[in-house]
């Protein structure tokens, strides 16, 4: 029995040590699993029609790309290919964590990709609509500077 427990303990340590979040920058994924930003197609946010309608496309499990230790889903193979060719052009700021939470020193708050906006040419995700509204009605540049400081502090601790 003690050999079984010891073996399970060693396996658990190996799994935790190999977890994607430990090696790469953190990415906003579901609590269980590695799907980024609620499975939304991060390339689709950049489409003019999506920006106008504010309705982002759901990604599908058949179009996936691994990046930063997370699984990014796409609505089409074309979107997956665009992302694979230039992921930095499509990954939301702070790798999809809530921009408002970072700007208010709340730390890393996961998002599901539903609440979002562009400030300048940058895509920001939010945990909830009040955070987005704060940025729309307030000084988004100042909020971004605060979020940037918090993000850099988090990255330096990793």
Regions found by a protein language model. Name each.
Residues 8-18:
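Bacterial N-terminal signal peptides
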Residues 1-9:
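Bacterial N-terminal signal peptides that target proteins for export
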